[in-house]
């Protein structure tokens, strides 16, 4: 198969451009000079807390020029002065203590335009009802709280500011002794800066979808695992994860991640009016492949006889051509509570009482470590009707983002593009984990693991910013035409030369290690429009749960680039080459067809190991340890 190597910018050309030598690598792919839009990290706030979820969901408030950050490690909301994005500064916190019981956990937040902060708070015992907490963005004063459903995991304020909508996930107890009901709470907000009364809370349940109810649950909505709640087993099994509200503020769309479905909520009546399954992704089709092994020593993205369960975490809504479309980040998630474990490696099927792969399955001959053997798959799906063997394998997540109609029709899926982008941008750390730098550490699980997203409008273009939780970074797509999105750029404010977990485990100071490592584990993203930004240009803010950092990116559109801070040279460091851009495709296929990024990416199914070693040799010759174009952030 013809394998085309990406062009490399010569070291001499980099020197001619005057790029200073640097010590921390901020990946910019493709070369910024060839991108219509690039993300440039300009400032970071560090907590110094490693792998403690010290920076998760973020929200920017224009009137105060403040950024609000969920810090699950401290149980507080950190408040940053973001009036100078190059030097975000902690100026205070919002605490639930004194209003809610000790041990309550902050999970999510949203800020209304007038400064009403709304935070989703989980109870100290997670199977008890939680709360929405309200505060003033200017004074940081807590205004009050109302009780909502069990384990509110995400909250969103409607575009018109009238409602707060919380996804009450209601996970089982850690030992699976209790499995409470999932629900969605709809809270009518006061028009002024005040907490609503408890009477303003309405909760949409799933009771009508139970056996004997007025609605029938579609067959492909995944209901599985121990049935602990015998009164409302479907309601207990459904786990609302993330909420988006349409532009008219009339309908909420809620991901049911483990169930691989989306719930539709009518906000006027606070009722669930529809649940539609997302179906499954055929990884056996060209352009929809995956790299399933962390033990083959090569980047091998190819079609495989596996179905992917989309299982999105984040979801966003936008309008195009007079219609509303939904965008999902297809992370994937397996259930594991108490003695129940949903996942197993393919090579372990047939052991310890687990049914084997059916002998007539195409996967039966692919159980070696270099094939499908290492891939984690679901034990809840794919069994033959008699329970004797697995006739189909289902892996977790889509390793992609998707665009859907509001009726659940798939309009676009990025196929294997995200893995191919990462393979070309950071070949020596392809599918790395977040806590440590490695090669293919996550190929056997969910690959780059797209977790969340933000949608932003710049001029007449609409962009999706998709965070990759494991390898890190943000992928940008132009989604103005929902049927024909195109890849724009990828930025990763991470230095792979710093393996954070390894250094900290051997005595490294976490604060120092994390400053050098950069951003690990992007969890929350917020787009700041130019008219709201302190710089007058768009910004993107990311909360990174593993590094505990909050980073501000300048969103540079071609012709109006915002310069970043001056680079800081490191001892003996040398500049490294950047990778040339893939040209965005000109789609000609039907809307639901998956396409590769461009002709410059290696062909689907190609073994990329010769290319990877060639690329690695060039980078190592540059003295950079395999890192790409670098720009050091000032702390």
Regions found by a protein language model. Name each.
Residues 10-20:
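Bacterial N-terminal signal peptides
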Residues 559-606:
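C-terminal low-complexity, Ser/Thr- and acidic/Pro-rich disordered "stalk" regions positioned immediately N-terminal
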Residues 26-571:
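Beta-sheet-rich non-transmembrane sensory/scaffold domains
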Residues 1-10:
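Bacterial N-terminal signal peptides that target proteins for export
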Residues 22-28, 610:
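Signal peptide processing junction and immediate N-terminal pro/mature segment
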Residues 610-635:
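C-terminal membrane-anchoring or membrane-association module
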Residues 4, 595-596, 634:
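Basic polycationic patches enriched in arginine
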């Amino acid at each position: 198969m013809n394998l085309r190597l990406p062009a490399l910018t010569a070291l001499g050309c980099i020197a001619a451009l005057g790029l200073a030598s640097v010590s921390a690598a901020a990946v910019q792919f493709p070369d910024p000079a060839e991108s219509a839009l690039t993300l440039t990290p300009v400032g970071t706030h560090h907590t110094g807390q490693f792998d403690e979820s010290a920076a998760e969901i973020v929200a920017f408030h224009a009137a105060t020029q403040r950024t609000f950050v969920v810090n699950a490690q401290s149980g507080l909301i950190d408040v940053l002065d973001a009036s100078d994005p190059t030097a975000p500064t902690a100026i205070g916190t919002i605490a639930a203590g004194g209003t809610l019981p000790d041990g309550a956990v902050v999970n999510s937040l949203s800020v209304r335009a007038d400064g009403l902060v709304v935070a989703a708070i989980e109870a100290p015992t997670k199977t008890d009802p939680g709360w929405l907490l309200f505060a003033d963005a200017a004074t940081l004063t807590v205004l009050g709280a109302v009780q909502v459903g069990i384990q509110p995991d995400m909250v969103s304020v409607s575009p018109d500011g009238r409602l707060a909508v919380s996804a009450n996930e209601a996970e089982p107890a850690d030992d699976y002794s209790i499995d409470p009901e999932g629900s969605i709470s709809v809270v009518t907000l006061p028009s002024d800066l005040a907490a609503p009364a408890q009477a303003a809370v309405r909760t949409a349940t799933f009771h009508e979808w139970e056996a004997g109810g007025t609605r029938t649950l579609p067959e492909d909505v995944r209901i599985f695992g121990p049935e602990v709640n015998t009164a409302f087993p479907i309601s207990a099994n459904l786990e609302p994860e993330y909420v988006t509200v349409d532009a008219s503020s009339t309908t909420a769309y809620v991901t049911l991640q483990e169930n691989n479905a989306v719930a539709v909520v009518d906000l006027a009546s606070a009722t669930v009016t529809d649940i539609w399954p997302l179906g499954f992704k055929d990884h056996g089709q060209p352009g929809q492949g995956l790299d399933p092994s962390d033990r083959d020593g090569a980047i091998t993205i190819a079609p495989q006889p596996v179905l992917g369960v989309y299982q999105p975490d984040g979801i966003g809504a936008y309008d195009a051509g007079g219609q509303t479309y939904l965008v999902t980040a297809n992370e994937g998630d397996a259930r594991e509570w108490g003695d129940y474990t949903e996942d197993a490696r393919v090579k372990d099927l047939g052991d310890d009482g687990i049914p084997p792969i059916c002998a007539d399955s195409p996967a039966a001959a692919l159980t070696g470590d270099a094939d499908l053997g290492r891939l984690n798959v679901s034990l809840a799906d794919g069994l033959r009707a008699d329970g004797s063997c697995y006739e189909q394998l289902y892996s977790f997540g889509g390793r992609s983002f998707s665009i859907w109609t509001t009726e659940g029709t798939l309009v676009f899926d990025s196929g294997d593009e995200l893995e191919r982008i990462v393979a070309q941008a950071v070949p020596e750390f392809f599918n790395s984990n977040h806590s440590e730098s490695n090669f293919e550490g996550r190929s056997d699980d969910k690959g780059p693991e797209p977790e969340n997203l933000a949608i932003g409008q710049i001029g007449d273009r609409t962009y999706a910013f998709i965070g990759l939780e494991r390898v890190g970074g943000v992928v940008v797509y132009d989604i103005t035409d929902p049927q024909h999105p195109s890849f724009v750029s990828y930025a990763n404010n991470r230095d792979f030369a710093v393996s954070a977990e390894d250094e900290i485990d051997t005595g490294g100071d976490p604060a120092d290690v994390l400053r050098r490592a950069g951003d690990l584990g992007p969890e929350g993203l917020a787009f700041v429009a130019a008219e709201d930004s302190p710089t007058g240009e768009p910004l993107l803010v990311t909360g990174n749960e593993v590094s505990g950092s909050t980073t501000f990116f300048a969103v540079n559109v071609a012709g109006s680039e915002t310069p970043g801070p001056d680079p800081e040279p490191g001892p003996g460091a040398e500049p490294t080459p950047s990778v040339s851009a893939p040209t965005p495709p000109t789609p000609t296929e039907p809307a639901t067809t998956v396409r590769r990024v461009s002709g410059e990416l290696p062909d689907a199914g190609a073994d990329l190991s010769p290319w990877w070693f060639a690329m690695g040799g060039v980078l190592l010759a540059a003295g950079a340890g395999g890192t790409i174009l670098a720009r050091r952030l000032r702390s």
